[in-house]
Amino acid sequence: MSIASYVLVAFRRHTDTAIEAGFKYLILGSVATLVMLLGIASIYRETGGIALPVTATTAGPWLRIGRACFLVGLGLKSGIVPLHTWLPDAYGRAPSSVSALLAGIVSKSTLYVLFRISLGLGMQAETLGLILLLFSFLNMTVGNALALLQRYTKRLLAYSSVAQTGYVMFAVGLGLRYGRPAAIRAGFFLLLAHAVLKALAFLSKGVCHYHRDVTLTRELRGTAAQIPLVAVTFAVALIGLAGIPPLAGFAAKWWILTESLPAPDGWVAAGIVIFLVNSVLALGYYLPLIVRLFDNSGAEG
């Protein structure tokens, strides 16, 4: 899947930016794979095998190194801050249909594998939960802050994916550290909802680009006048991603918040505040996009 993704990102080979983004994605993806291979070698040195049932019941320094390697490698492939630098370029410069595939399937499946492999390798649920909570704060804050600064629509959507990954990590980390399985289910529900909604957003953006050569966020004005159905589908996707009722994005975030209360300690209390603040910050770039879609002052004729 990774090799196909590298090629698809650079599919528009007649443009230097696509080649650059594809090459950057290839290099960083290869580094992630090499780090995970180093992890496999470390685990094999400790246990004499790579079967998960064996590694889950074994302890040792090389096994800890192996777990760390898998966390770093899969974290890079999932776009976890500060290993996310490839993601805006890959999402922003690939064809919109490829961006939808990357956001909807590739990154999400890698994040799921990170959760499963880390536990399968015997990492304590409480330890993994704390790691996910800490990095979720970074993802939410960095993703939303950088999205607010973007002028290019696809890069804005890319950085919002970084933030959405943080919401999922917060829910799963909460569930693992404090033994709240419903929080984990809420996180996976948000993961699925985001995959569908973000894919819809990228596909809608692709149709806008095809019909109107839209690249910048301000160029979305007049979309409803010229291609009203696309404006509606794009708006639905953005409303869901913003967590506005009654769509799945709101339901998932509400579920996560209800499972985080009452806060068992300061980490979760801080996480709830960061979660809410970032959800409000996200409205600062989602709502202007929705308004521009239905602002006909930019329509021709």
Label the model's feature ranges:
Residues 1-2:
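Hydrophobic alpha-helical hairpins/lids featuring a short glycine-rich hinge
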Residues 5-254, 258-283, 291-293, 297:
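Hydrophobic transmembrane alpha-helices and their helix-loop junctions in integral membrane proteins
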Residues 299-301:
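Short, intrinsically disordered, charge-balanced linker/junction segments flanking boundaries
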